[in-house]
A protein has these predicted regions:
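Formylglycine-dependent sulfatase
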Residues: 1-172
Length: 172
């Protein structure tokens, strides 16, 4: 019976879309489409096993993702935003990235920056230290940063950056 932020924006005439990890249920009414999102592209399970070309969901139908999932989620969100702007419709886009998170997979262009790099961070317990895992997590953060930058650039290109509120937070 809870009213979500997406329900509120939708009721106010906004286009609503979610692109990425949804960890709140996959069955209606807990599915994103049952929580105020007209457009949903992502995965609703608690964990995903492969981040390249994964099986994802688009409004209830299983589809094959395209490339690295975080890049794909960003692409779909930018398409949604562009379509909303073309229709002169305000939009609420929710883009919950799933990385950095296992499995520690990231596109080579981001991995290469950290592969073999000396790390200044160290685990307090040397027995628990996993340098390759840390490098992969840093590469994933670099990818998230790149994707957020692409999204902000898209907002500027569409001429809506000064009239758009962007909130960024992350739980990993």
């Amino acid at each position: 019976d809870e009213v979500t932020i997406a329900d509120t924006f939708k009721a106010a005439g906004y286009a609503t879309g979610a692109f990425g990890k949804w960890h709140n249920g996959m069955q209606y009414p807990y599915h994103p489409n049952g929580r105020g999102f007209e457009e949903y592209y992502g995965f609703t399970s608690g964990h995903w096993g492969h981040y390249f070309d994964p099986v994802l969901e688009h409004n209830g139908a299983l589809v094959r993702g395209s490339g690295f999932c975080v890049d794909d989620f960003t692409n779909k969100a930018m398409e949604f935003i562009e379509d909303s702007v073309k229709q002169d419709k305000p939009f609420f886009a929710y883009l919950p990235y799933n990385t950095p998170h296992s499995p520690m997979q990231v596109p080579d262009r981001f991995w290469k920056k950290f592969d073999g790099a000396e790390l200044g961070m160290r685990n307090r317990d040397p027995k628990k230290e996993n340098v390759q895992h840390t490098r992969a997590a840093l590469a994933m953060c670099e990818n998230v940063d790149w994707n957020v930058g692409r999204l902000l650039k898209k907002l500027r290109k569409l001429g809506v950056a000064d009239n758009t509120i962007v909130v960024f937070f992350h739980d990993n």
